[in-house]
């Protein structure tokens, strides 16, 4: 899949999974997204779940041909995205790994090594030149882990948004974005609204035309719509006006009372 003339999708779909993170039902599977940014030098954006490492490494080789990657950029250390880091570093011994300082601490714990001789530590507004383009790194702590960074490609105006703007579902299943993106946000990121708000403020200063998340489809059109939704969700505002009545009813009597209350509210103009 071409994201642009120089950015290729190299991720995988997982239809074997039934519960994402052991708790979220995903009837349409999951996508673990990864991207190849090709310039004078080549950067691979994040890895995939270790169970799909062979497929992913094959995708890299198919896209790159005779070329070899120069950098692996690790934006997020959750195992569905970092699980194949060690396999990548074995397969491409000349490549360097780019990540935040906290991410390298996690690598030491996860893999028994932090790739000391091959690491590039980045922080807020640090840059990496690939040739004709420059990647800028933006810290995004607690969106939704402490080590997270996102990456901006100033040439193609692409934001690699880590878990931001992600959704449940594999990419080979067509479905509406909002429902599963909302469920993903509430379950995965929802408690970190202030952190998301801080990241949205940083993103507002960028000219973004494409958003490449780690789950779900690449967003290329009407970005304001998606950003506005994220602003609403992360500020804990309501998408629509309305009243929710939460109840349980052992014998059915509370249900009857709730139905009467709902009817009274409707008659008084509540949506």
Regions found by a protein language model. Give the residues of each.
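N-terminal beta1-alpha1-beta2 submodule of the flavodoxin-like/Rossmannoid cofactor-binding fold
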Residues: 224-271
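Active-site metal-binding motif and surrounding structural segment of the metallo-beta-lactamase
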Residues: 40, 51-98
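Conserved beta-strand hairpin/beta-sheet module of binuclear metal-dependent hydrolase folds
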Residues: 2-64, 150-153, 157-161, 243, ...
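Cofactor-binding loop segments of dinucleotide-utilizing enzymes, especially the Rossmann-like FAD-
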Residues: 12, 100-102, 163, 246-250
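Active-site neighborhood of phospho(di)ester-bond hydrolases with catalytic His/Asp-centered motifs
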Residues: 45-47, 69-77, 97-100, 159-162, ...
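Short, glycine/acidic-enriched loop or turn micro-motifs at the edges of active sites
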Residues: 49-50, 79, 166, 218, ...
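Metallo-beta-lactamase
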Residues: 2-5, 99-221
């Amino acid at each position: 899949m071409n994201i642009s003339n120089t950015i290729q999708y190299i991720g995988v779909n997982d239809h074997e999974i039934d519960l994402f993170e052991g708790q979220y039902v995903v009837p349409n599977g999951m996508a673990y997204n990864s991207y190849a940014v090709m310039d004078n030098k080549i950067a691979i954006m994040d890895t995939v779940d270790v169970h799909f490492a062979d497929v992913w490494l094959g995708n890299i080789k198919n896209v790159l041909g005779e070329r070899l990657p120069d950098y692996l950029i690790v934006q997020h250390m959750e195992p569905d995205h970092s699980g194949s880091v060690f396999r990548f570093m074995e397969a491409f011994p000349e490549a360097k790994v780019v990540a935040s300082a906290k991410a390298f601490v996690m690598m030491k714990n996860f893999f028994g090594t932090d790739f000391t001789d091959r690491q590039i530590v980045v922080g807020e507004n640090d840059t990496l030149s690939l040739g004709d383009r420059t990647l800028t790194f933006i810290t995004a702590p607690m969106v939704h882990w402490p080590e997270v960074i996102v990456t901006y490609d100033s040439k193609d105006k692409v934001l690699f948004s880590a878990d931001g703007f992600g959704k449940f579902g594999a990419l080979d299943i067509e479905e509406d974005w909002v429902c599963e993106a909302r469920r993903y946000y509430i379950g995965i990121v929802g408690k970190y609204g202030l952190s998301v708000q801080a990241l949205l403020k940083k993103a507002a200063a960028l000219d973004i035309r494409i958003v490449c998340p780690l789950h779900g489809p690449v967003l290329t059109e009407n970005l304001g719509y998606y950003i506005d939704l994220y602003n609403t969700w992360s500020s804990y505002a309501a998408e629509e006006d309305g009243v929710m009545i939460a109840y349980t009813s052992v014998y059915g009597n509370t249900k009857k009372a709730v139905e009467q209350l709902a009817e009274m509210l409707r008659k008084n103009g509540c949506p």
